Amino acid sequence: MQHIIKTALQQTFNYKTNKSIYNILVGKKSHQTFFDACSQQQLSLYHSLPLLKYPSFELFLENITEFNAEMEIMLHPRYTFESMGQTFQAIQLLVQTMSNTMQQDFRFVPISQNNKIQETVKIVYNYIKENKLQIDFENELHNLFKAITLKGPCYLHYYLQGYDEPMYTRQQVSLIEKLSQQQLFEYEMNNLVTMMFELKSGEYTILSKIIMKPTLLNQTYITYTRLLEQFTMEDIAAQQQVKINTIEDHVLEILIKGYMSNYDDYVEQEDQLQFLNFYQQHRGERLKFYKEQFDTLSYFQLKVLIVGFERGDLNVA
């Protein structure tokens, strides 16, 4: 836990409050927290410590100079801790499904009861079977865990479950590896981050189909469906009887969580280039500072561009 908090603190812009750091770690469902996490490339820390109490958080900050970091927590700019965990659960379920069906056992209890995960795995499983890609799947799985191991000790393999092969619990793994469960959690977090980078590398035709995006808030999901139906932001605001600012927050969440990447719809390319050239030299400032330099851009447009840059969707040519 301490390594995670210290990493968040080191990654946080100077003007941000301790409360904003805490909100990211516990996963506060607010659009400001989503933006804070994305703009500081801390999305993979979002909701990583949901049970953390604020007094404990403050106590650690007071004694941070006494804490000697023994490992580095890796970060991912595109996926929340929940979505990384769900992606691994999908891999667990796919491995379980492939292993059991190869033994003609179709009555096994799925390792994950999450409907979204089950639906995704079903699609990928059918894709493998219809295209006779069993060997390709096994090779990708082997290469994935080999790549994770190269970036540091890998413990995720303990949690795979096959036919007549139950998975280990974290307590069992901690005893086997002689690590505390907290140390193990932090190593597993790094394993998940490496896994997500690997899956997006272009080397995993099958397993990349199983990536689980962060979940959208309910009202944001409604806005997302309306945008897909080609309604304008103004139309959606009128339909939902809310201010346009609310829909702007929804759009930012949609971009942050990777459901759309249509930045050109919100900011002209010439404005994008001018701002991003400036931004990469002045990262970590307050929005007001950027607004003073680019008065023709709205705060919403500034946030859109910052999200695109920090996610790696927009680059300076």
Per-region residue spans from a language model:
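Long, charge-rich, low-complexity intrinsically disordered regions
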Residues: 1-317
